[in-house]
C-alpha cells in the first residue's frame, strides 16, 4: 500500500483570492450577502420574492439584542469552522455563552460557509442541536452567540475515559440520531462534519450537534450533493471518491464516531502499525478496504449489528436516522432509566468557571 496513489484523485484547488469586505457592507455598516443582512442590531433575512419590502425574522430567544458591550470575555475554548470560539459571560445577568467570532476579510468559499451557517442557525430549533441565541456584526467580525455546553465535546470525554460502555453509547447515540432526524427530514440539511469534537455535552447529560460551517441544505429529503468538504477521517466513501451523496453520509460518520467511543481508537488502523503515511493513504483505505466492524467477542450482537447498519460502503445499505432510532440496540436500553449525567459528573470538566 505504501507509495500508491489514491484510488481516485482528489480535485484540489488553490484558495480563492480574498474579497474586500467592503464589497459586502452597506453605508450603515451592515454586512449583506444575498438575502442576508447582519449588523449590531442582529440578523435579518429577506426573501427573494419580497426583496423590496424587507421583513425581519429576528430571533426570539433573547428579549434584547446583545452587543459586545454586554459580554465579558473569559477565555478561548476552541476553534470552529472559520473562527475562534470564546467563553463569555453576560455582564448583567451572568449567563455563560460560547461566542464564535468569524473574521470577514474573506475568501468567497469561506463567506458562503459563514452565510450558510448563519441561515441554518437562524432556522434551527431542536433539543439536540446547539442553540444559536443571536448573531451580530461588529468591527469586521460576525459573532454567533451560542449555547454554552459546559462539559465540552465527546472528544474531551474520550480523552478521559478512553472507552464508553454500551448502555451510555445507546443513550448518547439516541440523542444524536434525534438531532440528525430533525436536520435531515425537517430542515433538509446534511451536516457533513459529524465527529467527536462536534458533539457537545452539558452537565445535564444532554448531547447536541454543533458547527454548521460546512453543512449543505438540499431542496428536498431526496436530494444529493457532490462537493468535497468536512473532516476527512469520518468522511463516507462516496464523498471521498467524488460521487453524489445524501443524508446517509452523516450516518457513516456517526457509525465511525460511536465505534471509536467503544473501542478506544479510530476504527481504521494502518498496515504494519507504522501510522498513516499521509491523509491520502487513509482516504484510499476508507474507499478500498472493507468497512470496520465491532469485535463480536467484545460487544453485544445488537451493538455489532447497529455499527454494521451505519458503516456500509453502499449508502443504500445504510439505515436512516429514523430507522436507527428503532434499532434493537437503541431499544435495548430505553427502559433502563439510564442518565448520561452519571457519566459526565464523574469526569473533570474541560474548565472550571465560577458563574
UniProtKB/Swiss-Prot annotation:
The keyword Repeat does not apply. Gene3D superfamilies: Phosphorylase Kinase, domain 1, Transferase(Phosphotransferase) domain 1. Induction: By low temperature (12 degrees Celsius) treatment. Keywords: ATP-binding, Kinase, Nucleotide-binding, Phosphoprotein, Serine/threonine-protein kinase, Transferase. Its EC number is 2.7.12.2. The modification Phosphothreonine is found at residue 227. Activated through serine and threonine phosphorylation. It comes from the Eukaryota. PROSITE patterns: PROTEIN_KINASE_ATP, PROTEIN_KINASE_DOM, PROTEIN_KINASE_ST. One of its GO terms (biological process) is male meiosis cytokinesis. The modification Phosphoserine is found at residue 221. Signal peptide: none annotated. This is Mitogen-activated protein kinase kinase 1. It comes from Oryza sativa subsp. japonica (Rice). The gene is MKK1.
Amino acid at each position: 500500500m505504501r507509495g500508491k496513489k489514491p484510488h481516485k484523485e482528489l480535485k484540489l484547488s488553490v484558495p480563492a483570492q480574498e474579497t474586500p469586505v467592503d464589497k459586502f457592507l452597506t453605508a450603515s455598516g451592515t454586512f449583506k450577502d444575498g438575502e442576508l443582512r447582519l449588523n449590531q442590531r442582529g440578523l435579518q433575512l429577506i426573501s427573494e420574492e419580497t426583496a423590496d419590502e424587507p421583513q425581519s425574522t429576528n430571533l426570539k430567544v433573547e428579549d434584547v439584542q446583545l452587543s459586545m458591550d454586554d459580554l465579558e470575555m473569559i477565555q478561548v475554548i476552541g476553534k470552529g469552522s472559520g473562527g475562534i470560539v470564546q467563553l463569555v459571560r453576560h455582564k448583567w445577568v451572568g449567563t455563560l455563552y460560547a461566542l464564535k467570532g468569524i473574521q470577514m476579510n474573506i475568501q468567497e468559499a469561506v463567506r458562503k460557509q459563514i452565510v450558510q451557517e448563519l441561515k441554518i442557525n437562524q432556522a434551527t430549533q431542536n433539543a439536540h442541536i446547539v442553540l444559536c441565541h443571536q448573531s451580530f456584526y461588529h468591527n469586521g467580525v460576525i459573532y454567533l452567540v451560542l449555547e454554552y455546553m459546559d462539559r465540552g465535546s465527546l472528544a474531551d470525554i474520550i480523552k478521559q475515559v478512553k472507552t464508553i460502555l454500551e448502555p451510555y453509547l445507546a443513550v448518547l447515540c439516541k440523542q444524536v440520531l434525534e438531532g440528525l432526524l430533525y436536520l435531515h427530514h425537517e430542515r433538509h440539511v446534511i451536516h457533513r462534519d459529524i465527529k467527536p469534537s462536534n458533539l457537545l455535552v452539558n452537565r445535564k447529560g444532554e448531547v447536541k450537534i454543533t458547527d454548521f460551517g460546512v453543512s449543505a441544505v438540499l431542496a428536498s429529503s431526496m436530494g444529493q450533493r457532490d462537493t468535497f468538504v468536512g473532516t476527512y477521517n469520518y468522511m463516507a466513501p462516496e464523498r471521498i471518491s467524488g460521487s453524489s451523496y445524501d443524508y446517509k453520509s452523516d450516518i457513516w460518520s456517526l457509525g465511525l464516531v460511536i465505534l471509536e467511543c467503544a473501542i478506544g481508537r479510530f476504527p481504521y488502523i494502518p498496515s504494519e502499525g507504522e501510522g498513516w503515511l499521509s491523509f491520502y493513504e487513509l482516504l484510499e483505505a476508507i474507499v478500498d478496504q472493507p468497512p470496520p466492524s465491532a469485535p463480536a467477542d467484545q460487544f453485544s450482537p445488537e451493538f455489532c449489528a447497529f455499527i454494521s447498519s451505519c458503516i456500509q460502503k453502499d449508502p443504500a445499505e445504510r439505515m436512516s436516522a429514523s430507522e436507527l432510532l428503532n434499532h434493537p440496540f437503541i431499544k435495548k436500553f430505553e427502559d433502563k432509566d439510564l442518565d448520561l449525567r452519571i457519566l459526565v459528573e464523574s469526569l473533570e470538566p474541560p474548565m472550571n468557571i465560577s458563574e
